[in-house]
Amino acid sequence: MVSATAATVASVSPTVTALLAAIPSPAQGVWMLGPIPIRAYALCIITGIIVAVVWGERRFIARGGEEGVVTDVAVWAVPFGLVGGRAYHVATDWRTYFGPGREPIEALYIWQGGLGIWGAVALGAVGAWIACRRRGVPLPFFADAVAPGIVVAQGIGRLGNWFNQELYGAPTTLPWGLEIYERVDPSTGLPDPLTGVALDDTPIAVVQPTFLYELLWNFAVAGLVVWADRRFRLGHGRAFALYVAGYCAGRFWIELLRTDPATRVFGDIRINAVVSVVVFVLAALYVAFGKRGREVLEPSDEVSSEPGEKGAGETSRDESGGDEHGDRTVASSDPRPPAADSDRDSPLR
């Protein structure tokens, strides 16, 4: 995929160098530590995961959860998410790996890039559900706590596309266009878009920096979720649904700007644009019609790590005092958060 897009932009006129301003790409995305490759793509993903876990832990505790639960759930959710993300990418871009002249084994080469967020969230949620059951925590309560951190992690992960010089848009004359350089193997001088080094800082193209658009959009969505969560006391999975809806709205228009090869449906529409619309509608409906109020966890007298045991984990109720599953549940009518909690879930403190 990377080599194909590099070949496409190589044909662009060199007059792009006359632009007054542009965003430079890194000269390389891989560094060798002896025989071990250090990949910027992986470092960005790891950094995003750390941010999501740390911020999610703080929000989870601020909402009444037990310390350490988010880290425990991440041990399950992250591997499931990586597998799901890769599986979705391969399933929707199977022509890259299967067919005449292709190498099916490369479907496992996750370090070359290629993770589909839809598969990552879906299978990651399965891993989170398993871990939440083991800890006795309702999955919607957990999801609401970690939602802003997840979308920030996605934004940080987009920096990996910047280092890899991939998934960008069409050539542009905008002053914030992204410069694309030809990368080569220093030892042979042959083109090597993925692991090579740019020996010349003359761009072969200046393109739409879709990685940057999505990064900024994701950060804005995180801010929206935090604000709405404080203002409306979102619970029962509605904060997570708001994140999903917000992300899909941005992914739709950004997807239309991208020029990398993609599976197309309904004529000439990129499949991820279609998925964005479908998921947006479902998430928006849940935000609009989902259960109001915010549940509160109450630790039981005995806490067990095994699911199904008496006293295991924590029980939840609405802030109004009713049991979550009882007939007396009444959602809180006051949308304003208590003053003491107003800043407890902020990542900057």
Identify the function of each model-found stretch:
Residues 1-349:
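A feature for loop-to-transmembrane-helix boundaries and adjacent hydrophobic helices
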